[in-house]
């Protein structure tokens, strides 16, 4: 039986994570699927707001694309935190904010400039 349903999007570098969060009652508790795989198979790093807040009664279905594993993990973390924010109490929301789960890291790849080989790598300078 499903009580609540939330959707959220998280971004980090080139990664985009779209999640669907379901509130459940004991049946199949705490299942997190990422692109059809279990979360612990897909990600090696555990940066999960559920573990941080000790919440167990939510099922999460995640579709993530682009970037590498760390960027995807950060995008998933942000998306889950945004979905949890919509129904948690203010005390727990403040806890999420204090530990940086709700802030988006806006740093991304710098663009290549003309006259240079990469974003900042210049050709070798010859004085004569």
Swiss-Prot record:
Protein localization: Plastid
A GO molecular-function descriptor: RNA binding
Disulfide bonds: none
Keyword Ribonucleoprotein: yes
Cellular component aspect of the GO annotation: plastid; small ribosomal subunit
Biological process according to GO: translation
Keyword Ribonucleoprotein listed: yes
Pfam families: Ribosomal_S9
Coiled coil region boundaries: none
Keywords of this entry: Plastid, Ribonucleoprotein, Ribosomal protein
InterPro entries: Ribosomal_Su5_D2-typ_SF, Ribosomal_uS9, Ribosomal_uS9_bac/plastid, Ribosomal_uS9_CS, Ribsml_uS5_D2-typ_fold_subgr
Family according to the record: Belongs to the universal ribosomal protein uS9 family.
Protein name: Small ribosomal subunit protein uS9c
Taxonomic source organism: Euglena longa
Underlying gene: rps9
């Amino acid at each position: 039986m499903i009580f609540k349903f939330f959707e959220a999007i998280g971004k980090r570098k080139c990664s985009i994570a779209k999640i669907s969060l379901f509130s459940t009652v004991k049946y199949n508790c705490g299942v997190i699927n990422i692109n059809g795989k279990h979360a612990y198979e897909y990600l090696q790093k555990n940066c999960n707001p559920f573990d941080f807040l000790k919440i167990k009664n939510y099922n999460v279905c995640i579709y993530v694309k682009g970037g590498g594993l760390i960027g995807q993990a950060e995008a998933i973390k942000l998306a889950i935190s945004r979905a949890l924010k919509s129904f948690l109490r203010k005390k727990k929301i403040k806890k999420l904010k204090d530990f940086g789960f709700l802030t988006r890291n806006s740093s991304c790849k710098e663009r290549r400039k003309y006259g240079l080989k990469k974003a900042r790598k210049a050709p070798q300078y010859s004085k004569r």
